[in-house]
Amino acid sequence: MAARAGFQSVAPSGGAGASGGAGAAAALGPGGTPGPPVRMGPAPGQGLYRSPMPGAAYPRPGMLPGSRMTPQGPSMGPPGYGGNPSVRPGLAQSGMDQSRKRPAPQQIQQVQQQAVQNRNHNAKKKKMADKILPQRIRELVPESQAYMDLLAFERKLDQTIMRKRLDIQEALKRPIKQKRKLRIFISNTFNPAKSDAEDGEGTVASWELRVEGRLLEDSALSKYDATKQKRKFSSFFKSLVIELDKDLYGPDNHLVEWHRTATTQETDGFQVKRPGDVNVRCTVLLMLDYQPPQFKLDPRLARLLGIHTQTRPVIIQALWQYIKTHKLQDPHEREFVICDKYLQQIFESQRMKFSEIPQRLHALLMPPEPIIINHVISVDPNDQKKTACYDIDVEVDDTLKTQMNSFLLSTASQQEIATLDNKIHETIETINQLKTQREFMLSFARDPQGFINDWLQSQCRDLKTMTDVVGNPEEERRAEFYFQPWAQEAVCRYFYSKVQQRRQELEQALGIRNT
């Protein structure tokens, strides 16, 4: 530090200090005449800077005798201690050691921000590689191979579970339906007429018709499905119409209709009550609520594809299968279909595009037919068979779909796995720290002296990095450092640049005065 102060005290001097590189400074006598050379000695405790080219002082070009030059620019001193430039004065940028450059403050800030982001990212996302034990630990502890085997098994298990989850997600995109039997019960009761002698008023004879139903229990259902809430009877239908005998109830009162709306509340059955004391023939029309919607095919297309009622995607898929089986695709223009005699009769065209098929199918698809049940409402008190049962096929959501959804949405197991993974990462990190401590102590035990020297060198490098010190202060404080080949060229370039700068300033000043 004393040597550093000595250089800084010499650098800011004027003309005498600037020529210190020649080995001596010329003292100016009265009138500006050069006096005898005066040797500048170092301050107490300071080292003396000696130039590699000793010689007498020489006048600077472009300066009058006796004049003094004021210092310009940064102070001159040893590299790394004087001024702010990141390179030595007069030394080309390419000749500077890249490792000795001081990074700009903006670059340092960017590097620090990037490091913080990387640490946060690594803290949030643990990699599979963090669970792997280093090879050195596996050599020291042979029993750790069992852990590596478990890790490989876990990797395979994770891959299998992930593949299964993807399969389930793809399956949920398609409608998963299963066919069940819906049993419909149609019953009626008769209330005979009653007379009231007291007030002369009585009740007329009437009957009541009930339409209800339920799903038949399937022996293959699980306990989960058995305890599940039962669907209401009306949820299976889009509309229900009961048509009574028009001759008995007239054209305005012979129809009883129910249609589903957005605000419809589901019910377990329907009942109709009308006056009457004779048997009534009625027709029950039930329109199933298909989800997704299904359509009835044109009879010609139904015979060709072997489908009576189906969803639109299934119909298009069946038609494409027919085209592919009979090789009806145009070999030259693949977007066209060459219709055979059956397709020509149905679509009334010899050639059509694939993109036209959905539009052409629209005219061939009709609403599905309703379920028609004919029933006789009996008012005979001796008739014991007043309840009729009918079984129809309905499509309900597969119970497996609910289990699939619950499997995908369940997070309890994921949280438990994440907790165990964190424990594994902490354990592996502790093992790595213990391994580092073991290697540290083992190296010290083998060669204490060499280990201490290497450790001090490493700590010195870390200290320089932490304190942002550029260069090697231990070398730069010695005079031999400045007897290297670069010093002479650096000094000459520095003086030349200062002279050129001063000359330009003088020329500008003289030019202003002349004008």
Swiss-Prot record:
Entry's localization field: Nucleus
Record keyword Membrane present: no
Impact upon substituting residue 495 to L: In CSS11; does not affect the interaction with SMARCC1 and SMARCA4
Region described as Interaction with ESR1, NR1H4, NR3C1, PGR and SMARCA4: spans on this chain: 43-167
InterPro entries per record: SMARCD1_SWIB_dom (IPR038041), SWIB_domain (IPR019835), SWIB_MDM2_dom_sf (IPR036885), SWIB_MDM2_domain (IPR003121)
Record domain SWIB/MDM2: where: 290-367
Modified residues (Asymmetric dimethylarginine): 68, 88
Gene Ontology terms describing biological process: cellular response to fatty acid; chromatin remodeling; negative regulation of cell differentiation; nervous system development; nucleosome disassembly; positive regulation of cell differentiation; positive regulation of cell population proliferation; positive regulation of double-strand break repair
Coiled coil: 412-440
Main location: nucleus
Key words of the record: Acetylation, Chromatin regulator, Coiled coil, Disease variant, Intellectual disability, Isopeptide bond, Methylation, Neurogenesis, Nucleus, Phosphoprotein, Ubl conjugation
Disordered: annotated span: 1-103
CDD domains: SWIB_BAF60A
Residue numbers bearing the N6-acetyllysine modification: 223
Region (Interaction with SMARCC1 and SMARCC2): 168-474
UniProt record similarity statement: Belongs to the SMARCD family.
Clinical note on disease: Coffin-Siris syndrome 11: A form of Coffin-Siris syndrome, a congenital multiple malformation syndrome with broad phenotypic and genetic variability. Cardinal features are intellectual disability, coarse facial features, hypertrichosis, and hypoplastic or absent fifth digit nails or phalanges. Additional features include malformations of the cardiac, gastrointestinal, genitourinary, and/or central nervous systems. Sucking/feeding difficulties, poor growth, ophthalmologic abnormalities, hearing impairment, and spinal anomalies are common findings.
Purpose of the protein: Involved in transcriptional activation and repression of select genes by chromatin remodeling (alteration of DNA-nucleosome topology). Component of SWI/SNF chromatin remodeling complexes that carry out key enzymatic activities, changing chromatin structure by altering DNA-histone contacts within a nucleosome in an ATP-dependent manner. Belongs to the neural progenitors-specific chromatin remodeling complex (npBAF complex) and the neuron-specific chromatin remodeling complex (nBAF complex).
Name this protein carries in UniProt: SWI/SNF-related matrix-associated actin-dependent regulator of chromatin subfamily D member 1
